[in-house]
Structure formats: C-alpha cells, structure tokens
Design a protein with these regions (language model features):
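Short, contiguous alpha-helical
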Residues: 1-28, 56, 71-110
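Acidic/histidine-rich alpha-helical segments that form the ligand environment
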Residues: 10, 30-68, 89
Length: 110
C-alpha cells in the first residue's frame, strides 16, 4: 500500500508545485521495514482501499487543465503528465491487485 500512497502524493505535488521532481524511494527497502514484514495484512489492504477511494474521488474533480500538469520522474528525468500517469497508475494497480489476489489465495486468506 505504500507504493500506492506515493503515487497519490505525486498527483498532489503536480497540482501544488510547478513540475516538481518527485522523490524517488527504494521500494525493496521499504518492503523490508518492520511494519511491512509483521503487520497484519488487513492493515495494508485497508490502507490500499482508503488510498484508492481518495484518489478516485480526487481524480474525478480534476479539470482538463489540471490533467495537463506534470511532474518530473528522477529515475529517467522524464516529464509525466497527470493524464498519462492515470494510465500508468491503472496498469500498476491492476498488476499489484493480481499479486495481492495470488498471495491471498496462496495463504488461504481468500
């Protein structure tokens, strides 16, 4: 859920700053932190649901002008329009949901 929270914040940065360079973070290292390793899975699922609910509500309110705002991704120094990032994020979310569903089935939690 941390990755999705970062994406939500990126949308907000693009609306409140002029082409901000987003903060890069090391996802693998975040995944090794104690909360990621030991917290009940339901906490992450609840966080993911809350972030997605907020993001969907937020995105529905954006104007065409706002959708053309952008941020700079530091990994490749690429400018990313918010309207492009919606598509990237949709793919990313579906990819993560498939992993989550597989884990839930594998662990017998679903």
């Amino acid at each position: 859920s941390d990755s999705h929270h970062h994406s939500y914040i990126r949308f907000k940065w693009a609306l409140t700053e002029d082409k901000p360079v987003i903060k890069y973070y090391y996802e693998q290292l975040w995944a090794e932190l104690p909360d990621a390793k030991t917290a009940p899975i339901q906490m992450s699922l609840n966080h993911l649901k809350a972030v997605h609910n907020k993001l969907v509500y937020f995105l529905k309110l954006l104007t065409e002008e706002q959708l053309n705002l952008s941020f700079i991704h530091p990994e490749h120094n690429n400018e990313v329009l918010l309207k492009q990032n919606i598509g990237i994020y949709a793919w990313h979310s579906n990819h993560h949901y498939a992993h989550i569903e597989n884990l839930l089935k594998r662990k017998g939690w679903l």
